[in-house]
């Protein structure tokens, strides 16, 4: 990340190992007659602890996905920059019986496994969140048309429906999904409402088909 203020350039970067974070401040201290900078002062400081705290604040403690707090922040950021995105909401089907039958520990392990699969459904430029007990959200960078949205929903559904083997127990769940696109379907608030409505419409259809 690069920022500038009062002729000071701030660069945040991490080592290739991914576990050492630094902030580099570059300050011009001498200029030539042509106005070009001839001498710089570079100051580097460790910001690893700050990055770690920010990561913890934005991460769901159970699944390792981003949390609802960061979800709202990401959508706000997209809207402030007027960058298009596609939002997918998904709610697990048949999750409650897993908790009732095998206990909450098994339910937690299932949520972790679902989160792991969802990571494979998105690109590096996208985001995956846990926003409720068994509710998740995916934010895809860029707008997608209806055909692509339905393809993505089918991919999510097939990924989640594959049986899970947890502690020797085979568990099968499904996913009810809804989607909306910013700015095609309105502002970020309207997009969230529409995606939520479509998700619950999908859940009603899934219940009716049982």
Predicted segment positions?
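Short loop/turn elements at sensory-signaling interfaces that couple input to output
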Residues: 19, 24-40, 48, 187
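Sensory coupling linkers of modular signal transduction proteins
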Residues: 34-63
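Conserved nucleotide-binding and Mg2+-coordinating catalytic segments in signaling enzymes
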Residues: 54-73, 90-104, 112
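Short regulatory alpha-helical coupling segments
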Residues: 54-55, 68-84, 115-123
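Hydrophobic framework residues that shape the active-site pocket
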Residues: 95, 114, 128, 136, ...
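A short pre-motif secondary-structure segment
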Residues: 127-130, 171
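Catalytic-core segments of nucleotide cyclases and related cyclic-nucleotide turnover enzymes
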Residues: 150-157, 161, 165-167, 173, ...
């Amino acid at each position: 990340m690069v920022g500038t203020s009062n002729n000071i350039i701030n660069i945040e970067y991490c080592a290739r190992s991914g576990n050492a974070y630094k902030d580099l401040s570059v300050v011009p201290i001498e200029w030539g007659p042509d106005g070009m900078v001839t001498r710089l002062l570079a100051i580097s400081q460790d910001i690893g602890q700050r990055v770690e705290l920010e990561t913890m604040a934005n991460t769901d403690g159970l699944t390792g996905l981003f949390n609802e707090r960061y979800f709202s922040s990401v959508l706000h950021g997209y809207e402030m920059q007027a960058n298009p995105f596609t939002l997918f909401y998904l709610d697990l089907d048949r999750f409650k019986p897993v908790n009732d039958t095998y206990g909450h520990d098994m339910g937690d392990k299932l949520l972790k496994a679902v989160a792991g699969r969802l990571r494979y459904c998105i690109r590096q430029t996208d985001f995956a969140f846990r926003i409720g007990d068994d509710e998740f959200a995916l934010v895809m960078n860029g707008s997608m048309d209806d055909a692509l949205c339905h393809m993505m929903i089918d991919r999510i559904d097939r990924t989640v429906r594959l049986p899970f083997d947890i502690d020797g127990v085979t568990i099968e769940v499904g996913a009810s999904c809804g989607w909306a696109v910013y700015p095609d379907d309105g502002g970020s608030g309207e997009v969230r409402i529409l995606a939520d409505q479509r998700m619950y419409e999908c859940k009603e259809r899934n219940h009716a088909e049982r």
